[in-house]
Amino acid sequence: MGNPFIPFPRCENIIIVGDAAAEYLGALRIYGRGLIGGDVPSMELLHPMEKHLECVSCFLNDPTQVLMPAARRMKANFVVLEENGSADFNPAAGREALEKEGISVKILDVRGSTELVLRRAGKLFGEEKQAERIIRERTERLAALDDVRKSIRKGQKAAIFLAIRSPVRHESYVFRISERSALSQLLTNTFAIENINVRPNAEERIPGIQELDDLSDLFEKNPDLIVYTGDAAACGQKTAEFIRKHPQFAECNAVKNGRIYGAPYYCHALDLR
């Protein structure tokens, strides 16, 4: 039995709609019983405490179809809707439909600085002190990261890959990451590296994410670094298969010097990580 005098984690009888909202509340160690996400691959692995009900796109098509029966079945106290300002992917747009059905709704605005949103999340649950504690810890981590960043040689060439694992099929799908993606921008801006995947005519169903195709064009640019994000094992398997078929690329700087790194997947909803 847990210590009743330790206030966190708080497991609330609520449903959270929106990946960023779930992330900010999770940073405060406040969790719900249900989650509707859709922006972050494999969100169910990042938030195992919350039952995944559907994706945000499906929710916006009909806000009450899945959420309303779930809320009534679990007797949810209220629903937290993320307000992100998006014209076509904004969970807060479902507020009116839910309130018409008698479901209590609270809004968490995730626009603005990370510190500002953490304070909003803390205020929503009466946990202002916890929010300030998390902000202090984050500031300390960023200061430590700044020391690391200063030690990295600028201008290194990087090949960046993403593997997304399907929770249904248990299969992984590997992609290239282009300079358009938030993940690439975070890595290149933070560490002053260059993403060498530049294919302006490549099809992108999701901005910044491209089909793997033949990797020769990447390895011919002799990358200094190879970065695996998401399911790193799946990324490694694909690049290893390619190098076995094209052994000349084993001499590229990244492979020869063992400069192959795993990094978390990143998009705006994961700013806190």
Model regions and ranges:
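Extracytoplasmic substrate-binding proteins
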Residues: 94-171, 259-273
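Solvent-exposed loop/turn segments at secondary-structure junctions
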Residues: 20-23, 38-41, 84-88, 111-114, ...
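Structured C-terminal subdomain patch of bacterial secreted/periplasmic proteins
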Residues: 220-221, 228-273
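Short helices/loops that flank or line small-molecule/ion binding pockets
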Residues: 65-76, 124, 212-222
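N-terminal hydrophobic or amphipathic helices and topogenic motifs
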Residues: 1-11
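Ligand-binding pocket segment of bilobal, Venus flytrap-like solute-binding proteins
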Residues: 196, 203-231
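A short, structured surface patch at a secondary-structure boundary
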Residues: 13-74, 78-87
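Alpha-helical, coiled-coil/dimerization segments enriched in small aliphatic residues
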Residues: 39-45, 172-208
